[in-house]
């Protein structure tokens, strides 16, 4: 019988997981200073501001910067897992897109090259963590940043589409 190609994804994530940067530089910009980032701190993982001393009440944009080396150009998907709230991913200065809600997945086709690759992730939240009115004092403050789990998986093209079937 005929196969419904519209129901098949063009690319399927393989089980091959690629390495993420081992170290990240985290910086912050509020709505007035963006795109100028300040207050740089190092981090071993992508995280939420609640894990950075003194940053607990920040509202604005967090920038995570790291680099990874590739032996060859690859087609991969970056899945950020849980993010609070808006995420944009850049690879080598090119935006891979913006996500406002789950799933926080980014197709990195044609972005990861052989050699060194600069990864930049910007996460923006609303002013709720910084400005507290009388009613919001009783509401739970959501985290700000990336809770994960974060994965980078190599893609393999759907063989049926590749063969034109």
Which residues does each PLM region occupy?
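An acidic-aromatic loop/edge-strand motif
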Residues: 1-61, 94, 108, 112-165
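Residues that flank catalytic or metal-binding motifs in active/ligand-binding sites
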Residues: 20, 64, 85, 102, ...
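Surface-exposed coil/turn segments at beta-strand junctions on protein surfaces, enriched
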Residues: 57-59, 71-73, 82, 99-101, ...
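Short beta-strands within extracellular/lumenal beta-sheet-rich domains
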Residues: 58-69, 104-106
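Aromatic-lined ligand-binding clefts that engage carbohydrates, nucleic acids, or primary amines
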Residues: 68-92, 119-122
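Solvent-exposed beta-strand/loop surfaces of large extracellular or lumenal domains
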Residues: 84, 90-106
């Amino acid at each position: 019988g005929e196969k419904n190609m519209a129901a098949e994804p063009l690319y399927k994530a393989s089980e091959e997981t690629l390495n993420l940067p081992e170290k990240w530089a985290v910086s912050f910009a509020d709505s007035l200073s963006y795109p100028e980032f300040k207050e740089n701190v190092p981090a071993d993982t992508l995280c939420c501001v609640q894990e950075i001393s003194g940053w607990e009440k920040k509202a604005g944009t967090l920038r995570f910067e790291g680099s990874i080396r590739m032996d060859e150009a690859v087609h991969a998907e970056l899945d950020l897992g849980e993010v609070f709230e808006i995420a944009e991913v850049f690879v080598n200065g090119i935006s891979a897109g913006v996500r406002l809600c789950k799933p926080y997945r980014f197709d990195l086709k044609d972005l990861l090259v052989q050699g060194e690759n600069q990864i930049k992730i910007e996460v923006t939240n609303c002013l709720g963590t910084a400005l507290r009115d009388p009613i919001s004092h009783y509401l739970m403050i959501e985290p700000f940043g990336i809770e994960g789990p974060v994965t980078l998986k190599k893609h393999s093209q759907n063989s049926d589409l590749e063969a034109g079937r």
